[in-house]
Amino acid sequence: MRDELVWIDCEMTGLDLGSDKLIEIAALVTDAELNVLGDGVDVVIHADDAALAAMGEVVTEMHSRSGLIDEVKASTVDLATAEEMVLDYIRTHVKAPKTAPLAGNSIATDRAFIVRDMPALDSYLHYRMIDVSSIKELCRRWYPRIYFGQPVKGLTHRALADIHESIRELQFYRRTAFVAPPGPSTSEIEAVAAALDEGKDAPGPSDSASAPPTG
């Protein structure tokens, strides 16, 4: 059974949907085991000088350091072309529309810009999303040792590199926070479900987030 995930990361001139511009989008498709399929796609989208001049100081410094501003100025790719390039790659590995969830970090922000600027791409994706940031936040509360032990991110603020880091982060959580394959037995699952139905606390590990992790 095929069960792909579509990983997307966007770089924008800011986070305001009313005024900011989408200036880079990258995509990678993985299988259910988080193996990357193909080379992916990374597209820098042209924006005019006025849009770049309107960026805040922090965003300007970030995109200058990464080299993205110079690439945006030099790019001749518009939004429609970028959307088709991303869809061409995704369709190579995800044959049926509305079957593959969107995955990434804080992915709702990226999806909002995709909905606004790339409706055909949004329509091809499943409505469900897998947000690695949600797992991060749960680990911070439930398993702080895992949270504080996660791999250091490069923070390049370039779309394709950020996707690779998000995939690596989910691989880390899978090996540390999730039950090892093949998972609990049917009887163990039934016991947890029954306990929750009865309003009881289901048995499980504890790892207080109120203090730095030990051991």
Curated annotation (Swiss-Prot):
<dbReference type="GO" id="GO:0003676">
    <property type="term" value="F:nucleic acid binding"/>
</dbReference>
<dbReference type="GO" id="GO:0005737">
    <property type="term" value="C:cytoplasm"/>
</dbReference>
<feature type="compositionally biased region" description="Low complexity">
    <location>
        <begin position="202"/>
        <end position="215"/>
    </location>
</feature>
<dbReference type="Pfam" id="PF00929">
    <property type="entry name" value="RNase_T"/>
</dbReference>
<feature type="domain" description="Exonuclease">
    <location>
        <begin position="5"/>
        <end position="170"/>
    </location>
</feature>
<keyword id="KW-0378">Hydrolase</keyword>
<comment type="function">
    <text>3'-to-5' exoribonuclease specific for small oligoribonucleotides.</text>
</comment>
<keyword id="KW-0269">Exonuclease</keyword>
<dbReference type="InterPro" id="IPR022894">
    <property type="entry name" value="Oligoribonuclease"/>
</dbReference>
<dbReference type="InterPro" id="IPR036397">
    <property type="entry name" value="RNaseH_sf"/>
</dbReference>
<comment type="similarity">
    <text>Belongs to the oligoribonuclease family.</text>
</comment>
<feature type="region of interest" description="Disordered">
    <location>
        <begin position="196"/>
        <end position="215"/>
    </location>
</feature>
<keyword id="KW-0963">Cytoplasm</keyword>
<dbReference type="InterPro" id="IPR012337">
    <property type="entry name" value="RNaseH-like_sf"/>
</dbReference>
<dbReference type="GO" id="GO:0000175">
    <property type="term" value="F:3'-5'-RNA exonuclease activity"/>
</dbReference>
<protein>
    <recommendedName>
        <fullName>Oligoribonuclease</fullName>
        <ecNumber>3.1.15.-</ecNumber>
    </recommendedName>
</protein>
<dbReference type="InterPro" id="IPR013520">
    <property type="entry name" value="Exonuclease_RNaseT/DNA_pol3"/>
</dbReference>
<keyword id="KW-0540">Nuclease</keyword>
<feature type="active site">
    <location>
        <position position="127"/>
    </location>
</feature>
